[in-house]
Amino acid sequence: MRKLFLTGVFAAIVSVPAISVAAPDGKNRKVTVANMSNHVLRELYASPVTAKTWEEDMLGQRTLASGKTISANIDNGTNECYYDLKGVMDNGRTVEERNVNVCAASKWVIGETSDSVQ
């Protein structure tokens, strides 16, 4: 399974500037994930739409508290722009956004009852 690299720094946790590496094709795949729900985001996945399974959890041992954001460079080296995004909250709720153009979208807002990609 291809590895998904998270090269952005978790801005909500660490107060240092985000570090990112430009993709070989020059396209920005950096997406800000904003947790505007009342729950903690426990898991975060981003997989190319062509993948049959979810890539590894991008948060690892970390979580994203309510009201916080992270910045992630979603680039697994395939030069793909269309990804499926998935989050798992601490209450078991799963949120998904399918077929997201991460080369154009810059923010995924996870709300209490709805989600949006901007």
Show where each model-derived region lies.
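Hydrophobic helical h-region of N-terminal Sec-dependent signal peptides
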Residues: 6-18
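Extracellular beta-sheet/turn segments enriched in Thr/Pro/Gly and aliphatic residues
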Residues: 93-118
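Intrinsically disordered, low-complexity Pro/Gly/Ser/Thr-rich segments with frequent PxxP/GP/PP motifs
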Residues: 52-78
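A short, solvent-exposed beta-strand micro-motif common in secreted/extracellular proteins
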Residues: 80-89
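Positively charged n-region of N-terminal signal peptides that target proteins for export
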Residues: 1-4
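Boundary at the C-terminal end of the N-terminal hydrophobic targeting segment
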Residues: 20-24
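Asparagine-centered strand-capping/turn motif at beta-strand->loop junctions
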Residues: 31-40
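Structural beta-strand segments of beta-rich domains
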Residues: 27-31, 70
